[in-house]
Amino acid sequence: MPSPRILIHGGASVAFWRTAPTDIRTAALRGLAAASAAGAAVLRAGGPALDAVCAAVMVLEDDPLFNAGTGGVRTSAGTLELDAALMCGATSRCAAICGVNRLLNPIDGCRRMLDAGKPAFMWGPHAEQRCLGLGAVSRRDDGPVPLESHAAGTVGALALDAAGRLAAATSTGGLAGKMPGRIGDSPVIGAGTWADQGCAVSCTGDGELFIRAAVAHHVALSTSPLAAAAAQHLGRVATLGGMGGLVAMRADGSLTAAVTGGDIARAWWTADGVSGAGLLAGDPWPT
């Protein structure tokens, strides 16, 4: 059985990472490494993949550099509408929320919903009420954030634990300046997030097109080598006129990060002692 491992992404962008000042890129790499380390700590202790992906994503949600949780971008009306999803590969249990603004860590809300059972997908104040009632922590709204303050995207994490179980988590503030009420692919199981017994996937990019192409599910179902499957289905997004990226991991331990039309922030760790992080094409990639 392959050793435990974690793979995360901090969003795909056409130009943000390559044009960002050095201090921003350094901070981003530091944040990615911290998220990877948080997930790795869970796996080292023998914890489940679900706990590992939630721990990793919560670090990114707490980092204002990334477009999730604390760093979530605003709609065209200046409101905050956060989305997140979580899926357990071993059981096919999942939970997703969208359009929330009162949760400090939306992915923690998803975990509490997943553990509680039905419903699996909730929106807005009803999702908030459900998650807060299950013990999720509320956030303080510090007021409007300039729409141009972030250009990077969604965050996500995948993990394989010592028992061979996979999990996937995705969290986002969505598209900067989006129409209020708009929901992208991140909380849509099978489009932006997926995990089964064989594969886990988390996506980032032009959400409407990832929904149309059901990217996460198609990558998971593919019998092609993982990198080829990722390239094929990101190619479908490109054919539809969009850009984006994804991270994917199989139960055999193979993993990949891929992007079309830009760059994707990524980091990874395996119990075999392999780890790394990167933002640009010339930076390290997981293999």
Spans of model-derived segments:
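Alpha/propeptide regions of enzymes that mature by internal proteolysis
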Residues: 1-287
